[in-house]
From Swiss-Prot:
InterPro entries in the record: Kinase-like_dom_sf, MAP_kinase, MAP_kinase_CS, MAPK14, MAPK_p38-like, Prot_kinase_dom, Protein_kinase_ATP_BS
The species this protein was found in: Canis lupus familiaris (Dog)
Superkingdom, taxonomy of origin: Eukaryota
Pfam families reported in the protein's UniProt record: Pkinase (PF00069)
Keywords: Acetylation, Apoptosis, ATP-binding, Cytoplasm, Kinase, Nucleotide-binding, Nucleus, Phosphoprotein, Serine/threonine-protein kinase, Stress response, Transcription, Transcription regulation, Transferase, Ubl conjugation
The keyword Kinase belongs to this UniProt entry's keyword annotation: yes
PTM info: Dually phosphorylated on Thr-180 and Tyr-182 by the MAP2Ks MAP2K3/MKK3, MAP2K4/MKK4 and MAP2K6/MKK6 in response to inflammatory citokines, environmental stress or growth factors, which activates the enzyme. Dual phosphorylation can also be mediated by TAB1-mediated autophosphorylation. TCR engagement in T-cells also leads to Tyr-323 phosphorylation by ZAP70. Dephosphorylated and inactivated by DUPS1, DUSP10 and DUSP16. PPM1D also mediates dephosphorylation and inactivation of MAPK14.
Annotated function: Serine/threonine kinase which acts as an essential component of the MAP kinase signal transduction pathway. MAPK14 is one of the four p38 MAPKs which play an important role in the cascades of cellular responses evoked by extracellular stimuli such as pro-inflammatory cytokines or physical stress leading to direct activation of transcription factors. Accordingly, p38 MAPKs phosphorylate a broad range of proteins and it has been estimated that they may have approximately 200 to 300 substrates each.
Single Gene Ontology MF annotation: MAP kinase activity
Enzyme Commission no: 2.7.11.24
Entry cofactors: Mg(2+)
Record's subcellular location: Cytoplasm; Nucleus
Gene: MAPK14
Domain Protein kinase: 24-308
Name under which the protein is recorded: Mitogen-activated protein kinase 14
């Protein structure tokens, strides 16, 4: 929020009271989830169509309060063309004492990758450009020591020019319940996260990119498991059962025993699975969909893969400023998280306006 307090107005939408600065007009509900509801709006100050998210009960518990702080800190830090960033954050409150609501403003993104895949089978050039942008965004995110954890087609926004932004970081760790059954939340998950095999690292996101890329090339979900076990079977049928060196790394004894009880399967020849695909695309998939996360390609390495030769530019694949996540290990009271969040709202400086955006 800027130092001079703007004039706010109130309206009720979908049984929720929205209290927003006058610059945001024509609010119309576009969706709601567990963590808030979202309206599309017109920003009269910039001429941009924006998404305004009102967080739901941001400070109702310590977990909520910490999640609210985490989301604001993350969004404030992200400054990259392929990652959703924060255009504005505001509260109608005039002081910390009356601070209870947080509104986040981001670009309004039209379609997501889900809509795109459903509509058409993509050309190889489209796939190159889309996956290149995901990896370019991931290189930036990973350089700040952040793991997305929940990359899937519905979390990737794409505009008419095929420009892509990564949305919705895995801020809230998914509950077991949300991961159960025939659900997309799980289809793109790396096996080590899905099955709690071990401490995971950033390459969980690379596994997800491999699943997404395979889907763009074929028009079909790669591992549409009906449950955790079915999903693991689909994965192992393609990549083969783990060898002794990987089994040693799985810290969960029950997971080790279960895997050892399965019939040994060799890795399939990816060229026979992705028939007709660009051989370079197949080669990259083989480097992403590796069961052993230590041997999976990184985002930075993948950008330099021959498949992206026409897009790769090492001087235009930036990394992030260091991101201080020491708060993650802190145990604070609700009011302390709330006060930290209030400081972040008040100290927000809007990003410089991009001329191209204003003309579009």
């Amino acid at each position: 929020m800027s130092q001079e307090r703007p004039t706010f107005y109130r309206q009720e939408l979908n049984k929720t009271i929205w209290e927003v600065p006058e610059r945001y007009q024509n609010l119309s509900p576009v969706g709601s989830g567990a963590y808030g509801s979202v309206c599309a709006a017109f920003d009269t100050k910039t001429g941009l169509r924006v998404a305004v998210k009102k967080l739901s009960r941001p400070f109702q518990s310590i977990i909520h309060a910490k999640r609210t702080y985490r989301e604001l800190r993350l969004l404030k830090h992200m400054k990259h063309e392929n990652v959703i960033g924060l255009l504005d954050v505001f509260t109608p409150a005039r002081s910390l004492e009356e601070f209870n609501d947080v509104y986040l403003v981001t670009h309004l993104m039209g379609a997501d990758l889900n809509n795109i895949v459903k509509c058409q089978k993509l050309t190889d050039d489209h796939v190159q450009f889309l996956i290149y942008q995901i990896l370019r965004g991931l290189k930036y995110i990973h350089s700040a020591d952040i793991i997305h954890r929940d990359l899937k087609p519905s979390n990737l926004a794409v505009n008419e020019d095929c420009e892509l932004k990564i949305l919705d970081f895995g801020l809230a760790r998914h509950t077991d319940d949300e991961m159960t059954g025939y659900v997309a939340t799980r289809w793109y998950r790396a096996p080590e996260i899905m099955l709690n095999w071990m401490h995971y690292n950033q390459t969980v996101d690379i596994w997800s990119v491999g699943c997404i890329m395979a889907e763009l090339l074929t028009g079909r979900t790669l591992f549409p498991g009906t449950d955790h076990i079915d999903q693991l079977k689909l994965i192992l049928r393609l990549v083969g059962t783990p060898g002794a060196d990987l089994l040693k790394k799985i810290s969960s004894e029950s997971a080790r025993n279960y895997i050892q009880s399965l019939t040994q399967m060799p890795k399939m020849n990816f060229a026979n699975v992705f028939i007709g695909a660009n051989p370079l695309a197949v080669d990259l998939l083989e480097k992403m969909l590796v069961l052993d996360s230590d041997k999976r390609i990184t985002a930075a390495q993948a950008l330099a893969h021959a498949y992206f030769a026409q897009y790769h530019d090492p001087d235009d694949e930036p990394v992030a400023d260091p991101y201080d996540q020491s708060f993650e290990s802190r145990d604070l009271l609700i009011d302390e998280w709330k006060s930290l969040t209030y400081d972040e709202v008040v100290s927000f400086v809007p990003p410089p306006l991009d001329q191209e955006e204003m003309e579009s």
